[in-house]
């Protein structure tokens, strides 16, 4: 298992607000929670940046973290990430913050400690670009969106 350094920035983390953890053995992501002093209502169409009270340092350039939406919040309440996906580089050491966008027609209130997103650690391959005049021909070629069909 890969070790990731986590710094607690708010004394409530690990006390009244749980640390991120995997819910089950098969969980790919850990829930990130809102580190708020009071409830926060996000009006329709509004975006808010919400702190999690933790900073992390992955340290290994072979890994990165992504912040992804929680499916229930998006499907049931229209609360998704304002930047769609958050990418945390291995050398970042600051607080994890979640951009929450209310795309619904109803206001949504986030309570202190609510689960607002999930954190997934992923392997990274850094590629080196090689300039060429032409590519080796493939069946797909330059066919883009929808080119491979529907079935």
From Swiss-Prot:
Cofactor names: Mg(2+)
CDD domains noted in UniProt: trimeric_dUTPase (cd07557)
Catalytic activity: dUTP + H2O = dUMP + diphosphate + H(+)
Source domain of life: Bacteria
Keyword Hydrolase: yes
Gene3D superfamilies: 2.70.40.10
GO molecular function, one term: magnesium ion binding
Keyword terms of this UniProt record: Hydrolase, Magnesium, Metal-binding, Nucleotide metabolism
Signal peptide from the UniProt entry: none
InterPro entries: dUTPase, dUTPase-like, dUTPase-like_sf, dUTPase_trimeric
Pathway named in the protein's UniProt entry: Pyrimidine metabolism; dUMP biosynthesis; dUMP from dCTP (dUTP route): step 2/2
Residues the entry annotates as binding substrate: 70-72, 83, 87-89, 97
A Pfam family of this chain: dUTPase
GO biological process: dUMP biosynthetic process; dUTP catabolic process
Listed EC numbers: 3.6.1.23
Similarity remark: Belongs to the dUTPase family.
Protein role: This enzyme is involved in nucleotide metabolism: it produces dUMP, the immediate precursor of thymidine nucleotides and it decreases the intracellular concentration of dUTP so that uracil cannot be incorporated into DNA.
Protein name: Deoxyuridine 5'-triphosphate nucleotidohydrolase
Gene name for this UniProt entry: dut
